[in-house]
UniProtKB/Swiss-Prot annotation:
Pfam families cross-referenced by the UniProt entry: CBFD_NFYB_HMF
Disordered: region residues: 90-139
Keywords for the protein's UniProt record, in alphabetical order: Activator, DNA-binding, Nucleus, Transcription, Transcription regulation
Subcellular localization, as worded in the UniProt entry: Nucleus
Single biological process term from Gene Ontology: regulation of DNA-templated transcription
DNA-binding interval(s): 8-14
Protein name according to UniProt: Nuclear transcription factor Y subunit B-4
Region Subunit association domain (SAD), annotated ranges: 35-46
UniProt feature, compositional bias: Basic and acidic residues: 90-115
InterPro entries linked: CBFA_NFYB_domain, Histone-fold, Transc_fact_NFYB/HAP3, Transcrpt_fac_NFYB/HAP3_CS
MF-aspect GO terms: DNA-binding transcription activator activity, RNA polymerase II-specific; DNA-binding transcription factor activity; protein heterodimerization activity; sequence-specific DNA binding
Known partners and oligomeric status: Heterotrimeric transcription factor composed of three components, NF-YA, NF-YB and NF-YC. NF-YB and NF-YC must interact and dimerize for NF-YA association and DNA binding.
Length: 139
């Protein structure tokens, strides 16, 4: 694996820089490469700490809580606070989405059941009308 292979994609780094800086700002190739190297190193540093924690706990998957823990352990409290808030919001949104989907499925089934009942009722009424008509015309 070459050094370039381990770096974040330069296009993504440049796009993020453009989003953060004023629209009239110019970004040199050297600036993009420097941020690319720093951001890659930062991510590796934090991920390595989180990965070591997982290894000690005999786990193979690094999760958001591990990243939060690593940031806190490394003394990067501002980042840890931001990640903690993000994790909380993410989990809340997931919980709401799950509840909404569960509610939609339940009400969807209820609607389907109601529709079936309505069709059956309409069919029964139609049959009665037809039977009445038949018996009336038979007289």
């Amino acid at each position: 694996m070459t050094d370039e292979d381990r770096l974040l994609p330069i296009a993504n780094v440049g796009r993020l820089m453009k989003q953060i800086l004023p629209s009239n700002a110019k970004i040199s190739k050297e600036a993009k490469q420097t941020v690319q190297e720093c951001a890659t190193e930062f991510i590796s540093f934090v991920t390595c700490e989180a990965s070591e924690k997982c290894h000690r706990e005999n786990r193979k998957t690094v999760n958001g809580d591990d990243i939060w823990w690593a940031l806190s352990t490394l003394g990067l409290d501002n980042y840890a606070d931001a990640v903690g808030r993000h994790l909380h919001k993410y989990r809340e949104a997931e919980r709401e989405r799950t509840e909404h989907n569960k509610g939609s499925n339940d009400s969807g089934n209820e609607k389907e059941t109601n529709t079936r009942s309505d069709v059956q009722n309409q069919s029964t009424k139609f049959i009665r009308v037809v039977e009445k008509g038949s018996s009336s015309s038979a007289r």
